[in-house]
């Protein structure tokens, strides 16, 4: 699927993939630095590195902190990092080749420089500037999804943040694993076009029911699933 994602992306297309930092893979002999190995696979496909975002959950779940038999002992402490990250990459151009409508709208204002020349400068609301700075900082705080519709359910905050910073309005967002439709909801809410792919009929029905209200209240008149 990585190869197919690379193939269908435009030359200035970006990709954002949410992965755990580490995993326990018995077939590989135990724990591995998963995000690093996943990036190497992306690099082999042809993706170029755009950045990495550290995800910080507002109320992180707790996991086993010590291995069996090592409680209050140095013998075999199980040191586990439950954190996840988002790997950002692009196809050929890190800069958008076609200008689009940004997520943040500034107000053009004429100002004079020290020599009295009049220039036009864009001014942005403080909240917009704060949001932009938080998105480019590389650490995104998100609220956990407590209403799990499927095993594939994840926080709406994550795709929303990625879509805001990586795409223009009316761009096409592709989710190759649609699940319960979280990315589609984020894209629809933020005025992006979207395509969702899902093999499970059960998940497809769940996503369809979830996305329909947002489509009906927004600009799309027809939902094809």
Which residue stretches match the model-derived regions?
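Short, conserved SAM-binding/catalytic segment
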Residues: 208-223
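Core catalytic lobe of class I
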Residues: 1-206
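Charged C-terminal helix
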Residues: 203, 222-225
């Amino acid at each position: 699927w990585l190869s197919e994602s690379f193939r269908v992306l435009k030359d200035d297309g970006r990709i954002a993939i949410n992965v755990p930092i580490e995993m326990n893979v018995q077939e590989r002999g135990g724990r591995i630095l998963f995000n690093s190995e996943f990036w190497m696979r992306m690099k082999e496909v042809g993706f170029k590195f755009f950045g990495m975002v550290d995800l910080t959950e507002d109320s992180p779940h707790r996991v086993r902190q010590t291995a069996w038999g090592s409680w209050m002992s140095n013998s075999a402490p199980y040191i586990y990092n439950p954190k996840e990250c988002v790997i950002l990459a692009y196809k050929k151009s890190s800069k958008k080749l076609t200008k689009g409508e940004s997520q943040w709208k500034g107000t053009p204002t004429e100002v004079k420089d020290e020599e009295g020349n009049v220039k036009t400068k864009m001014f942005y609301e403080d909240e917009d500037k704060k949001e932009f700075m938080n998105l480019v900082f590389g650490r995104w705080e998100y609220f956990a999804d407590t209403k799990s519709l499927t095993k594939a359910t994840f926080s709406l905050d994550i795709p929303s943040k990625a879509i805001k910073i990586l795409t223009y309005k009316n761009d096409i967002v592709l989710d190759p694993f649609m699940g319960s439709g979280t990315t589609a909801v984020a894209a629809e809410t933020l005025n992006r076009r979207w395509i969702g792919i899902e093999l499970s009929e059960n998940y497809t029905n769940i996503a369809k029911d979830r996305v329909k209200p947002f489509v009906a209240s927004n600009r799309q008149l027809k939902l094809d699933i």
